[in-house]
């Protein structure tokens, strides 16, 4: 089977599974980390317009080859933000006011921003605590340049994703009472995107279900 046929078959399967559970529009972000730009070109050929990267260097390189909506979803380092904001149009992982202050200074174009919320308080994995979330939201929503889209989260290691997304839905509903315009939810990966959608996810970040397994060292 050719690489085009393999990706096409996987992509159609994912799209069908999204359609089976979605009662609202869902943006499929194809996560291309560790995969070559040639795979991104195939995805574009198949109608994919949104691509996700966790690493600045990979995103910078591939975005030069394939135009589209590029999403950065990795943990943010301040010294990488000038580069990240040069190629990404969406950031899914803002969890620190200091990072937003840097974004305000270095971003060459308006960004769509999701705030990453931690569901278990393990901040080394990324994510602001619920108590910090509103302060961060006030900061971003007050920007005249950038757009606060909503929330992003990843289920804690070892937990039931369905329970995690149920918890996230409660946090989101409370958040939207304060910030009704920030109604987007970035949640769900290859193993659990249907559950995330059933709990309200508007953006799912799917890699291996479309492009195949990554090698263990990656």
What are these regions (language model features)?
Residues 203:
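Conserved, well-ordered active-site substructure
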Residues 1-191, 197-199, 211:
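Conserved alpha/beta-domain cores
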């Amino acid at each position: 089977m050719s690489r085009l046929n393999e990706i096409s078959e996987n992509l159609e399967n994912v799209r069908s599974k999204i359609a089976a559970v979605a009662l609202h529009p869902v943006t499929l972000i194809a996560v291309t980390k560790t995969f070559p730009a040639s795979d991104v070109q195939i995805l574009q050929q198949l109608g994919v317009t949104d691509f996700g990267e966790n690493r600045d260097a990979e995103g910078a390189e591939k975005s030069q080859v394939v135009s589209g909506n590029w999403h950065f979803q990795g943990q943010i380092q301040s010294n990488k933000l000038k580069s990240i904001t040069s190629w990404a149009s969406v950031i899914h992982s803002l969890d620190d006011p200091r990072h937003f202050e840097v974004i305000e200074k270095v971003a060459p174009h308006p960004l769509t921003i999701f705030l990453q919320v931690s569901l278990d308080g393990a901040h080394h994995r990324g994510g602001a605590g619920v108590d910090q979330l509103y302060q961060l939201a006030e900061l971003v929503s007050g920007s005249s340049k950038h757009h606060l889209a909503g929330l992003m989260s990843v289920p804690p290691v070892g937990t039931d994703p369905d329970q995690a997304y149920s918890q996230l839905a409660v946090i989101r509903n409370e958040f939207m009472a304060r910030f009704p315009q920030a109604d987007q939810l970035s949640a769900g990966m290859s193993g659990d995107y249907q559950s995330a959608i059933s709990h309200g996810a508007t953006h799912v970040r799917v890699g291996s279900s479309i492009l195949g397994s990554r090698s263990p060292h990656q």
